[in-house]
């Protein structure tokens, strides 16, 4: 029998402010010792391709939780962001830490068929790998004096560091691109929700989510060239004024009686 474990609220942060995705209920089919439900808070980190995640992220015996929400904003957000079956949303939890490392705990929310699910990232195997790497470095340090070619290990370490720098540069570039796209999505979502409120359109109306989605998709299509340049790392952010004008034009068109 399923039971509700907790409720998750997480923040989408951007330069124009923060949008909170609320009331994501996590349910489990497995029995738990605690009978009380708690509230988790977190923040959006990034989107990931589930097919490219390391094997240690998800163990075979870990729990997968079913996610539900009565929030129209949350439903619209997940519907828009999880259209790709392999896409996941990484959330860093504020109130929960990994028991072994005392590092922040992470959830990955994803869609499986028509159901919304999530799981906590398993860091156990990562810590084992880190331990093996530390042990290997210690062994290399002990045998360094007996290496016949002086400086050979230094060269290897230097090359490794250069590779890491190159990887970090690529990661920073991707993060910068993701930040620009996330900022576009956050600003667009706020403008649409604000425009609907100004027109007296309540989220209790049957076609509210449909109107939100077609406006969102149409705005993305309108600015497709700018978004393409952003994805290639050569474009600037779409200005607030330009996006506001687009949303106003679309809402006038879609809500015209």
Curated annotation (Swiss-Prot):
One GO BP annotation of this record: DNA replication
Record-linked InterPro entries: Sld7, Sld7_C, Sld7_N
Main location: nucleus
Name by which UniProt lists this protein: Mitochondrial morphogenesis protein SLD7
Subunit structure of this chain's protein: Interacts with SLD3.
Annotated keywords: Cell cycle, Cytoplasm, Cytoskeleton, DNA replication, Nucleus
Pfam families with a match to the protein in the record: Sld7_C (PF18596), Sld7_N (PF18636)
GO cellular component: cytoplasm; nucleus; spindle pole
Keyword tRNA processing: no
Organism: Saccharomyces cerevisiae (strain JAY291) (Baker's yeast)
Record's function text: Required for the proper function of SLD3 at the initiation of DNA replication. Binds to SLD3 and reduces its affinity for CDC45, a component of the replication fork. Required for mitochondrial morphology.
Domain of life: Eukaryota
Subcellular location: Nucleus; Cytoplasm, Cytoskeleton, Spindle pole
Keyword Cell cycle annotated: yes
Family that this chain belongs to: Belongs to the SLD7 family.
């Amino acid at each position: 029998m399923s039971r509700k474990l907790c409720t998750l609220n997480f923040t989408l942060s951007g330069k124009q402010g923060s949008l909170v995705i609320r009331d994501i209920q996590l349910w489990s089919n497995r029995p738990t010792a605690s009978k009380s439900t708690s509230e988790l808070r977190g923040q959006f980190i990034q989107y990931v391709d589930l097919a490219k995640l390391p094997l240690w992220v998800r163990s075979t015996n870990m729990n997968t939780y079913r996610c539900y929400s009565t929030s129209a904003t949350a439903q619209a957000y997940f519907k828009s962001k999880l259209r790709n079956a392999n896409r996941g949303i990484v959330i860093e939890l504020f109130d929960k830490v990994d028991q072994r490392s005392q590092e922040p705990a992470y959830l990955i929310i994803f869609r499986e068929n028509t159901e919304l699910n999530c799981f906590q990232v398993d860091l156990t195997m990562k810590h084992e790998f880190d331990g093996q790497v530390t042990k290997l470095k210690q062994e290399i340090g002990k045998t360094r004096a007996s290496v016949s070619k002086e400086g050979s290990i230094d060269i290897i370490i230097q090359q490794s560091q250069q590779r890491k720098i190159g990887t970090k540069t690529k990661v920073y570039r991707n993060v910068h691109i993701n930040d620009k796209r996330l900022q576009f999505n956050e600003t667009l979502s706020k403008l649409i929700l604000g425009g609907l409120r100004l027109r007296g359109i309540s989220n209790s109306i049957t076609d509210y989510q449909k109107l939100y989605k077609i406006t969102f998709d149409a705005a993305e299509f309108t600015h497709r060239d700018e978004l393409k340049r952003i994805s290639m790392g050569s474009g600037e952010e779409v200005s607030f004024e330009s996006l506001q004008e687009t949303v106003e034009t679309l809402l006038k068109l879609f809500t015209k009686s």
